[in-house]
Amino acid sequence: MLLGEMRRWGVAREMVDELLPNAARAIEWIEQFGDADGDGYVEYTRGTDRGLANQGWKDSWDGIRYADGRVAEAPIALCEVQAYTYGAYLATAHFAFEVGDTVTYDRFRAKATQLKAAFNRDFWLEEKGWFAVGLDADKRPIDSLTSNIGHCLWTGIVDEDKAQRVAEKLVSPAMFSGWGIRTLSKDSGGYNPISYHCGSVWPHDTAIVASGLARYGYDGAAQKLIFGLLDAAQAQGGRLPELFSGLDRGELTVPVGYPTSCSPQAWAAASPLLCLRTLLRLDPWIPYGKTWLSPNLPEGISYLKVAGIPLAGSRVTVEVGSDVPGGVVVTGLPKEIELIREPRRPSTAV
């Protein structure tokens, strides 16, 4: 996914080319070892009684729970891991297309299509209106409402007919604290707003969810999360920490810190950049000679200028505002790149 994103932006081409063999080995691992039981999903489990019981980004021992509060036991197929795998398959297909390898392109496009269909069938909880955070060892859905499902919007694996219900759940009072997205719904068993992964707010997680919401056209919901994060940063000296508590904003005037949170922390420091991209609705596909750009400024922001955006070996500046000619002015974009002034939908194939 990372190398595919770098290629889409047209940056560090030599570095990406150098790392492609490593990416190919990672794909081999997914195909040969990641899916231990052959059900089409990447699972994790530990081979000894030591090490991490949970091996997704929520790696605390109690980070994956059923809605009734029970802690799920491995092997577990996490929803966001399938979403990342979907993204990796698509990136592999596009790299193959670049070099004229139509066999590999067709194979990984097909794998991505199959994974998406299976995911929307097996992880979807129709009666609840959200995706399970994972499947347990018996392939039963782990049915708690979590922030993980926002990562699925982010990669585009979610069928569009399910996206609205997912979006509504993510920005509901049970999930949105006013500062950011809780890792676990406050209506779920095991919820603790001052836990590591069972009700706290992680800025990078919220930024990814906001990006996913915008990808499916829910710009108002995305902006709501982004403004929550910006307010949280302002209340904490302009710096977003690794995480903070999931207590409701209405209860206290500032976010309550997590006792051992890292600050600064790389994930959190990068979050405002993703939020900025989300507001710009910027989606470059440089290898195909296209860049989608459709800024949608929220109420209260009348002008925005972003300079130095690295695209296709150039540095691009975007100005947005009511006093800007045409509402948007882009400078520095190479002439061979077509600028498409609309958001790219998740189903758009290039």
Language-model regions, residue ranges each:
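Short, flexible helix-adjacent loops and helix caps
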Residues: 8-11, 35, 94-101, 124, ...
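Aromatic-rich carbohydrate-recognition surfaces in CAZymes
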Residues: 1-64, 79-82, 86, 142, ...
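Beta-rich accessory regions
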Residues: 95-110, 114-122, 126, 214-224, ...
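Extended glycan-interaction surfaces of carbohydrate-active proteins
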Residues: 36-77, 114-201, 234-257, 273, ...
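Catalytic cores of secreted or luminal carbohydrate-active enzymes
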Residues: 261-305
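Residue-level signal for cytosolic alpha-helical hairpin/rod architecture
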Residues: 89-90, 149, 206-207
